[in-house]
């Protein structure tokens, strides 16, 4: 099976009531771990790369690593997704490099730091949708800024994140604006702001509805029942990995991620894509620290990196099971980008909101 568009997987997930973890990748070991977990659980795969990942690995290296995964595991549907595109040009360069899905994050201006107006967000996202859909490529948009409801601050990831602090009106997606945004842009997926943020330091205490607004997802889903929703910054920050890192010389303070049971609530309310990066970073770090400490005389990097694949595979397999993704890869039928482009052109994939349906 060739690379597939995101819309194919999200439509299947919606029809069958499950969510799909979208794992960020930078290197060979991450891709191997994710695909091993996918084969183990018969799960479809979303591999996503930030601008930072593309710069770190190099366009050609990253593209060929993912294409190698497609060749090695032809029975697993794989999406190649651009995470947090800061401008149309970023999305277009991703499409040129075989990405089958792009995120136009117009919640921030092109500097990836300044919160953007609603009008700006609509305009840049719609521009990308028009170009991408003509090629059969899927588009994810974002409304609201990712950041902590505890502090009002965001966590920059690869240079992407607002500076300073914002109030709750900017940190929570407005349901009315969400309806207007989806109608105006026709995005395939909508990332919503509910109090999550990038990195390991998401919450200083176990999150409750006061600082993790799953109820906002439920409200948006009631207004947009046919729209695929996305949760960003949704690593769960496993306590066992934190403990292992600190046991072998780390110094990560007490911190909390997004509980799996809260993500599962989101999936019941239309969340189809769940972004995860930190959990795999913690798995790598725990494995490498442990291997280095137990055999300090070792100098072959494979001694440190092979355990990291095992640790990440365990995390990924757990998420595939917990989100209901497992068992679905073999049920998804290939549809080409060309066929998707034709469907977009005919209006067959237009998102119809409740508000639009009443008109």
Swiss-Prot record:
Per the Swiss-Prot or TrEMBL record, the active site comprises 83 (proton donor)
Q: Per its Swiss-Prot or TrEMBL entry, what cofactor is needed?
A: Zn(2+)
Q: How is the cofactor bound?
A: Binds 2 Zn(2+) ions per subunit. One is catalytic and the other provides a structural contribution.
Q: Read off the Pfam families from this record.
A: F_bP_aldolase
Which pathway is this protein assigned to? Carbohydrate degradation; glycolysis; D-glyceraldehyde 3-phosphate and glycerone phosphate from D-glucose: step 4/4
> Which catalysed reactions does the entry list for this protein?
beta-D-fructose 1,6-bisphosphate = D-glyceraldehyde 3-phosphate + dihydroxyacetone phosphate
Q: Where does Zn(2+) 1 bind?
A: 84, 198, 232
One of the entry's Gene Ontology molecular-function terms is: zinc ion binding
Q: Which NCBIfam families match?
A: cbbA (TIGR00167), FruBisAldo_II_B (TIGR01521)
What family is it from? Belongs to the class II fructose-bisphosphate aldolase family.
Q: What's the stated role of this polypeptide?
A: Catalyzes the aldol condensation of dihydroxyacetone phosphate (DHAP or glycerone-phosphate) with glyceraldehyde 3-phosphate (G3P) to form fructose 1,6-bisphosphate (FBP) in gluconeogenesis and the reverse reaction in glycolysis.
Q: What is this protein called?
A: Fructose-bisphosphate aldolase
């Amino acid at each position: 099976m060739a690379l597939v568009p995101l819309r194919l997987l999200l439509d299947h997930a919606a029809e069958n009531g499950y969510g799909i973890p979208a794992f960020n990748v930078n290197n060979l070991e991450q891709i191997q771990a994710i695909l091993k977990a996918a084969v183990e659980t018969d799960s479809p795969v979303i591999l996503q790369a930030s601008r930072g990942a593309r710069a770190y690995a190099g366009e050609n290296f990253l593209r060929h690593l993912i294409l190698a995964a497609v060749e090695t595991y032809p029975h697993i549907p794989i999406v190649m997704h651009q995470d947090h595109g800061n401008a149309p040009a970023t999305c277009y360069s991703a499409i040129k490099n075989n990405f089958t899905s792009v995120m136009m994050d117009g919640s921030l201006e092109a500097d990836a730091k300044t919160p953007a107006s609603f009008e700006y967000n609509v305009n840049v996202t719609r521009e990308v949708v028009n170009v991408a859909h003509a090629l059969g490529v899927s588009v994810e948009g974002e409304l609201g800024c990712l950041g902590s409801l505890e502090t009002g601050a965001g966590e920059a990831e690869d240079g992407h994140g607002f500076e300073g602090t914002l109030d709750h009106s900017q940190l929570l997606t407005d349901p009315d604006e969400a309806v207007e945004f989806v109608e105006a842009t026709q995005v395939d997926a909508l990332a919503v702001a509910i109090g999550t943020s990038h990195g390991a330091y998401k919450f200083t205490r176990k999150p409750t509805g006061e600082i993790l607004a799953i109820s906002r997802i439920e409200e948006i889903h009631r207004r947009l029942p046919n729209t695929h929703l996305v949760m960003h910054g949704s690593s769960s920050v496993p306590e066992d990995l934190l403990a292992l890192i600190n046991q072998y010389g780390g110094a990560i303070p007490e911190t909390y991620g997004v509980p799996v049971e809260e993500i599962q609530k989101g999936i019941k309310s239309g969340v189809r894509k769940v972004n995860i990066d930190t959990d795999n970073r913690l798995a790598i770090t725990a494995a490498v620290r442990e291997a280095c400490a137990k055999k300090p005389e070792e100098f072959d990097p494979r001694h440190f990196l092979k355990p990291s694949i095992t640790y990440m595979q365990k995390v990924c397999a757990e998420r595939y099971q917990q989100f209901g993704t497992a068992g679905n890869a073999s049920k998804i039928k290939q549809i080409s980008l060309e066929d998707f482009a034709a469907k977009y052109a005919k209006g067959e994939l237009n998102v119809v909101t409740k508000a639009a349906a009443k008109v």
